[in-house]
Curated annotation (Swiss-Prot):
Main location: plastid
Keywords: Chloroplast, Membrane, Photosynthesis, Photosystem II, Plastid, Thylakoid, Transmembrane, Transmembrane helix
Transmembrane segments annotated in the record for this chain: 3-23
The protein, known as: Photosystem II reaction center protein T
Similarity remark: Belongs to the PsbT family.
Pfam families xrefs: PsbT
Membrane topology recorded in Swiss-Prot or TrEMBL: Single-pass membrane protein
General function of this protein: Found at the monomer-monomer interface of the photosystem II (PS II) dimer, plays a role in assembly and dimerization of PSII. PSII is a light-driven water plastoquinone oxidoreductase, using light energy to abstract electrons from H(2)O, generating a proton gradient subsequently used for ATP formation.
A Gene Ontology biological process term: photosynthesis
Species assigned in the record: Chara vulgaris (Common stonewort)
Length: 35
């Protein structure tokens, strides 16, 4: 059970950092699809 909690926290932190970078400078690959 503890492993699940630690994994969830790790994924959550990585997700937040990923989102921060995403919004700071949007990737051009996705910009192509999302025009």
């Amino acid at each position: 059970m503890e492993a699940l909690v630690y994994t969830f926290l790790l994924v959550g932190t990585l997700g937040i950092i990923f989102f921060a970078i995403f919004f700071r400078e949007p990737p051009r690959i996705i910009a192509k699809t999302k025009k």
